[in-house]
């Protein structure tokens, strides 16, 4: 993501931003000579041009790649719920000695399906039933395994949450940097040249603006991937309860 975003910034964003700023400087110079008022429109290139915004976009695409891989993995596990992994005829009573035979198709699954939550939960349930012949123990082992998987999936989102926190923080760093630069150029504003001060204030507000917009998008995607993971765990538990 770093190479792609940096290439776009070097080849597209910053050259266009410099062209827009040069046009603005010429318009202001013409305004001072003629005394006419010139309206300067806000440009997206100028809003995006600084290094703070570039860092935010790099983090955004990085975290989106992480969530994309997680969404793909969860989707594969949800698709597995539509298959009949344990074939038990309706009305048939399953005996403890049948558990080993029923678990063989689960052990024959290819990777990575064999490591998915549903096959692991079914294997654990059948193994527990084969050793204890207790339905209560079967329900307990499925529930414990699903709870452990939910905790693991939640902990794996810690990097996503950290990046979601870091993006607006980078925006605020840009704000502090821009305001500090503006204060350093305050003597020029006193002399009548406010262009340096306004440019620095633009850096300050643009960085926060872009960072907050990106943060809103990332928070929404994080919420969606969390819902997908919770749904997968709950449907796996329901699948085991219904089919066993």
Locations of regions flagged by a protein language model:
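Juxtamembrane "helix exit" motif at the C-terminal ends of alpha-helical transmembrane segments
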Residues: 2-19, 69-70, 170-190
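Large intracellular
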Residues: 6-146
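Membrane-interface, cytosolic juxtamembrane amphipathic helix immediately N-terminal to a transmembrane helix
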Residues: 39-41, 45, 133-167, 191-199, ...
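Alpha-helical transmembrane segments of integral membrane proteins
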Residues: 49-59, 161-167, 202
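Bilayer-spanning, highly hydrophobic alpha-helical transmembrane segments
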Residues: 159-183, 205-221
């Amino acid at each position: 993501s770093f190479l792609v975003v940096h290439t776009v910034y070097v080849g597209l964003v910053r050259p266009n931003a410099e062209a827009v700023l040069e046009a603005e400087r010429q318009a202001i110079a013409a305004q001072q000579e003629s005394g006419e008022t010139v309206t300067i429109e806000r440009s997206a290139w100028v809003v995006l041009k600084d290094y703070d915004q570039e860092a935010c976009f790099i983090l955004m695409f990085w975290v989106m790649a992480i969530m994309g891989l997680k969404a793909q993995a969860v989707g594969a596990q949800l698709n597995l719920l539509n298959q009949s992994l344990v074939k038990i005829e309706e009305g048939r009573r399953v005996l403890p000695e049948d558990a080993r035979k029923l678990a063989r198709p689960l052990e024959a699954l290819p990777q990575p399906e064999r490591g998915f939550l549903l096959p692991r939960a079914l294997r654990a349930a059948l193994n527990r039933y084969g050793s204890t012949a207790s339905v209560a123990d079967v329900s307990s082992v499925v529930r414990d395994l699903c709870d452990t998987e939910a905790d693991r999936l939640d902990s794996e989102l810690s990097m996503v949450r950290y990046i979601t926190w870091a993006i607006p923080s980078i925006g605020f760093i840009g704000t502090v940097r821009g305001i500090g630069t503006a204060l350093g150029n305050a003597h020029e504003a006193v002399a009548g040249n406010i262009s340096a001060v306004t440019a620095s204030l633009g850096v300050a507000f643009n960085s926060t603006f872009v960072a907050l917009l990106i943060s809103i998008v990332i928070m929404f995607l994080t919420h969606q991937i969390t819902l997908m993971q919770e749904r997968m765990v709950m449907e796996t538990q329901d699948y085991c309860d219904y089919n066993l």
